[in-house]
């Protein structure tokens, strides 16, 4: 559908969708074809290109959530509490849900109305939801198998009844441009002969301290929360809920907000110690501020949030692999153009935390801005053509070398390996790992083979899981020589095939099957027309 947005002089914002009004019996959600919002400037409402407009029965949802079991008391697939979630295509997906707090119990006692949950689809094991509910409303992410993430977010602040359901891929990044920078890039990659696990399937809980400078807090203020403290913490909880959904499933890493994180929500710009609007300066300041307020021994990693006085959002990590490292574990910061933290901004912060956990950039582009900025390209981990598309890529920010818009919510194989090494045997191994009942899956990529030039091919893996869990497969090219982009068929080195979303099928066609059938040539999946060697790795999840 194409939304129509009208802004009148009386600040009346009208949202219209082409979908007929709907009401599902017994549902928490009602579909709307139009919504009028009073008192909001256009800049406060950033709309995806396509969306589904909804009204939520808040009281009914609150009653349902009060019955959700605690995570420690039930397996997710055995929860009897069911929640229908509206998808952008007009359908609903039913999830079994349970509590999944991201705040330390002591912090949760101080803010009992801020809560987090997780769920698994009743009919598709690849659909997972991670959401939070608080006085600022419902904020949720659904991870799907092939369509990319779905988000359900409030239309505007101070309205907990009206929501948008949309695919992240339909969010126009030009509305909220993002930028990343990192220092100490350029480390060598782990040996590519490694064929083991990206992790050991043990859960590692890291104590996370998120600071919000006074400008971020003030921008979070509303009529019901004039100081902005509660809203800022609720927004941070939204962010960590979504990040945990990815970090837990990809890395068996859980982030938990420290017991006194509320002390890091500042309200006085004259005394908070931050240089708002400058992420690099804030990242350096954050270390001393957090150490001084909560103590260096009371957290494992920290990141500061501020407000960007210009356009868009920008983040930085002053180092690669700083988690658990006294003296540098708080040297990360992001300044945002929207304190509601849109999905793109949360992905940016997820990316910066990836640096703090030991991952480098994965893009191969070396000439297009912003990819060509000094110190950002790391040849040792440049396995993705162009801008790349995974979390540690520069998707959407590399001009003509953009593979796609928003980053996909998974890590490239090299990032999994870097972070896995860092938290198991490297400097990020400070938490005591918790054994889980989940067994490691096994996978076999098969043998090597030779094919004629310019010939489509397929790779097939064989996977097994002792627990009977549904598996996904992700085939990725593992050649990192720097080349010209888009890749050419005459390239004798470097990546010529992009990564694709993990799939339930163990088979990947190169290029993708629809283009093979149609006889077209995808820009980011290029068959070599000359003799060369290509390396591939498959990751099973």
Question: Which residue ranges define each predicted feature?
Answer:
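A broad, structure-centric signal for solvent-exposed, well-ordered loop/edge residues
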Residues: 7-8, 104, 126, 366, ...
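Extracellular (secreted or membrane-anchored) zinc-dependent metallopeptidases
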Residues: 198-539
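A broadly conserved detector of short glycine/acidic/proline-rich loop/turn motifs that flank catalytic sites
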Residues: 10, 101, 123, 144, ...
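Extended, hydrophobic interaction surfaces within ordered domains
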Residues: 15, 145, 150, 154-158, ...
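Bacterial Sec-dependent N-terminal signal peptides
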Residues: 1-25
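Zymogen propeptides/activation segments of proteases
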Residues: 19-283, 461, 473
């Amino acid at each position: 559908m194409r939304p129509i947005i009208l802004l009148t002089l009386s600040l009346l914002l009208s949202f219209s969708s082409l979908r007929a009004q709907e009401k599902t019996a017994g549902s928490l959600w009602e579909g709307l074809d139009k919504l009028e919002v009073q008192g909001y400037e256009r800049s406060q409402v950033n709309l995806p290109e396509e969306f589904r407009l909804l009204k939520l029965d808040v009281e009914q949802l609150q009653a349902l959530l009060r019955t959700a079991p605690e995570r420690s008391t039930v397996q997710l697939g055995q929860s009897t509490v069911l929640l229908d979630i509206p998808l952008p295509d007009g359908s609903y997906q039913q999830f079994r849900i349970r509590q999944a707090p991201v705040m330390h119990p002591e912090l949760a006692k101080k803010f009992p109305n801020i809560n987090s949950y997780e769920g698994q689809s009743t009919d598709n094991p690849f659909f997972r939801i991670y959401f939070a509910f608080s006085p600022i409303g419902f904020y949720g992410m659904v991870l799907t198998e092939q369509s990319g993430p779905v988000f359900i977010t409030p239309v505007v602040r101070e309205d907990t009844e009206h929501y948008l359901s949309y695919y992240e891929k339909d969010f126009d990044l030009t509305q909220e441009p993002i930028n990343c920078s990192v220092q100490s890039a350029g480390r060598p990659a782990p040996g590519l002969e490694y064929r083991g696990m990206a992790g050991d399937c043990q859960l590692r809980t890291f104590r996370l301290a998120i600071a919000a400078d006074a400008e971020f807090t003030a921008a979070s203020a509303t009529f019901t929360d004039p100081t902005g403290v509660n809203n800022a913490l609720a927004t941070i909880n939204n962010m960590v809920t979504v990040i945990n959904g990815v970090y837990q499933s990809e890395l068996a890493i859980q982030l938990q907000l420290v017991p006194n994180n509320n002390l890091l929500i500042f309200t006085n710009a004259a005394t908070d110690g931050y240089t708002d609007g400058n992420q690099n300066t804030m990242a350096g300041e954050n270390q001393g501020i957090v150490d001084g307020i909560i103590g260096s021994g009371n957290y494992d990693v920290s990141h500061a949030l501020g407000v960007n006085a210009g356009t868009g959002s920008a983040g930085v990590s002053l180092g690669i692999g700083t988690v658990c490292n006294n003296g540098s574990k708080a040297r990360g910061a992001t300044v945002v153009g929207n304190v509601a933290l849109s999905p793109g901004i949360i992905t940016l912060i997820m990316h910066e935390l990836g640096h703090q956990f030991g991952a480098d950039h994965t893009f191969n582009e070396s000439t297009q801005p912003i990819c060509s900025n000094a110190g950002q390209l790391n040849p040792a981990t440049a396995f993705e053509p162009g801008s790349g598309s995974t979390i540690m890529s520069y998707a959407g920010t590399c001009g003509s070398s953009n593979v796609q818009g928003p980053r996909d919510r998974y890590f490239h194989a090299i990032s999994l390996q870097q972070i896995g090494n860092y938290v198991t045997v490297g400097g990020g191994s400070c938490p005591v790992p918790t054994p889980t009942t989940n067994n490691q899956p096994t996978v076999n990529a098969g043998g090597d083979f030779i094919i004629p030039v310019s010939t489509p091919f397929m790779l097939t893996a064989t996977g097994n899981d002792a627990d009977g869990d549904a598996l996904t497969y992700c085939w990725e090219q593992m050649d990192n020589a720097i080349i010209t982009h888009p890749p050419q068929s005459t390239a004798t080195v470097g990546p010529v095939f992009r990564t694709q979303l993990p799939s339930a099928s163990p088979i990947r066609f190169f290029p993708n099957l629809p283009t093979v059938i149609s006889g077209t040539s995808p820009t980011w999946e290029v068959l070599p027309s000359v003799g060369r060697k290509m390396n591939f790795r498959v990751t099973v999840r």
